[in-house]
Amino acid sequence: MADVTYRLVICGLVQGVFYRGSMVSRANALGLRGWVRNRLDGSVEAVVQGEATEVNRMVEWARRGPSNAVVTSVNIFPSEGDFVGFQLREST
């Protein structure tokens, strides 16, 4: 099955609740590639790449996040790129 790549923008109470670290752990467990970072507007942005089934599992996880997060929306956009591993990036 071909790989898919999505950019996610996650809104709500998603900073200061270990969202990014939890996403890195989840992505590694699912064998995904890409990155995640905080944005200055209080949201979290991620690019997720891998097998469609596993990427969809990550999107479902992103809608919930870790236990202390309160996710109000996840905007999903098609994306491109070629990534190795899943990285925590600096805020923008």
From Swiss-Prot:
EC number of the protein: 3.6.1.7
Keywords: Hydrolase
GO molecular function: acylphosphatase activity
PROSITE patterns hit by this protein: ACYLPHOSPHATASE_2, ACYLPHOSPHATASE_3
Domain Acylphosphatase-like: 5-90
InterPro entries, sorted: Acylphosphatase (IPR020456), Acylphosphatase-like_dom (IPR001792), Acylphosphatase-like_dom_sf (IPR036046), Acylphosphatase_CS (IPR017968)
Keyword Transferase: no
Active site annotation, chain numbering: R20, N38
Top-level lineage group: Bacteria
Name of the top EC class for this enzyme: hydrolase
Catalytic activity: an acyl phosphate + H2O = a carboxylate + phosphate + H(+)
Pfam families in alphabetical order: Acylphosphatase
Protein family membership: Belongs to the acylphosphatase family.
Protein name per Swiss-Prot or TrEMBL: Acylphosphatase
Source species: Albidiferax ferrireducens (strain ATCC BAA-621 / DSM 15236 / T118)
